Amino acid sequence: MAGNRSNDIKVHCSFCGKSQDEVKKIIAGNNVFICNECVALSQEIIKEELAEEVLADLTEVPKPKELLEILNQYVIGQERAKRALSVAVYNHYKRISFTESRDDDDVDLQKSNILMIGPTGSGKTFLAQTLAKSLNVPFAIADATSLTEAGYVGEDVENILLKLIQAADYNVERAERGIIYVDEIDKIAKKGENVSITRDVSGEGVQQALLKIIEGTVASVPPQGGRKHPNQEMVQIDTKNILFIVGGAFDGIEEIVKQRLGEKIIGFGQNSRKIDDNASYMQEIIAEDIQKFGLIPEFIGRLPVVAALEQLNTEDLIRILTEPRNALVKQYQALLSYDGVELEFEKGALEAIAGRAIERKTGARGLRSIIEETMLDIMFEVPSQEEVIKVRITKEAVEGQSKPILEIA
């Protein structure tokens, strides 16, 4: 409420002492008044303190072993990938702390962004999310297939940065230390090495556009999203300290690796190694293979850390269902416990759920939908059946051959 401009009473700001005639606006509270100038000053102070808190947080980044322990609580398997990510993330934030305090003649540490290669449902997105959460930094996810280079219909690359700014509650300083995960990066690969001379709206052009923000630039972002327009107000964000993690399935890249290794074996004749499965080939990927798949050399050069994830097997999926702190089985047990009902999944049921996920080629991503299909009728009926004290999910229930077993008090 604005101050009363009576001829008899002149209101003054309780903080700076200026009268209502000396400022644009005075806001009244319970026997307290504050002017617009003091409000603006308060905002600046809060902004500076938040920025200092961000910098302070960076000095307390968990060591690689500590990061690995955090990942192990939530992510099953993928040991090599978790180690690579733990080291890369630690070095990234250590680099930021070093840069903030460095002298001009100190070594210039370059940013090491990350490329994750692995099949659908192997945990790429979840790994990135877990890292960001453990570090308490803003996190944003983007889909590379929705992006186009400037001037074409689609989503501008800069809109990725807007998502990060929004995740940081529009605190730009905090966003500038965040993590961005770009999924489906393999879908914007050039189709073959002999690229058409026609305009490539969603392939190489997007790689070039992403390259600019990944390597570090001051980008102008429309605060409301959408396309840029002349005279539009922009938010400036420096991307040099944003960690970019890009991921994709890269279906077929193992064939490129096989071909390269096969040529070397023929060429040298000796010391040949037999690699028996595609998972082993994935661990042999080098920049040359990724370039042959269709990513441009400049883009690959900005992604020096490559983490290959393996296809999850039945045992991995069962462990994912039961072991992590936020395991799906634990979540559904908690849901039914609120109704006073115990929930048990038999071993055969867990194997059947994992088997279905493998059949559908959805990996860990498809586990929840399979449980939802199995549990739908139970979650609908049981809350109204006060006599039910326990529900047992069997293999037959998962396969749709029978209903779950109910135990009555």
Swiss-Prot record:
InterPro entries: AAA+_ATPase, ATP-dep_Clp_protease_ClpX, ATPase_AAA_core, Clp_ATPase_C, Clp_protease_ATP-bd_su_ClpX, ClpX_bact, P-loop_NTPase, Znf_CppX_C4. Keywords: ATP-binding, Chaperone, Metal-binding, Nucleotide-binding, Zinc. Coiled coil: none annotated. GO terms for biological process: cell division; proteolysis involved in protein catabolic process. Pfam families: AAA_2, ClpB_D2-small, zf-C4_ClpX. Residues 1-54 form the ClpX-type ZB domain. It comes from the Bacteria. The keyword Heme does not apply. One of its GO terms (cellular component) is HslUV protease complex. Zn(2+) binds at C13, C16, C35, C38. GO terms for molecular function: ATP binding; ATP hydrolysis activity; ATP-dependent protein folding chaperone; protein dimerization activity; unfolded protein binding; zinc ion binding. ATP binds at P119, T120, G121, S122, G123, K124, T125, F126. Component of the ClpX-ClpP complex. Forms a hexameric ring that, in the presence of ATP, binds to fourteen ClpP subunits assembled into a disk-like structure with a central cavity, resembling the structure of eukaryotic proteasomes. ATP-dependent specificity component of the Clp protease. It directs the protease to specific substrates. Can perform chaperone functions in the absence of ClpP. Belongs to the ClpX chaperone family. This is ATP-dependent Clp protease ATP-binding subunit ClpX. It comes from Streptococcus equi subsp. equi (strain 4047). The gene is clpX.
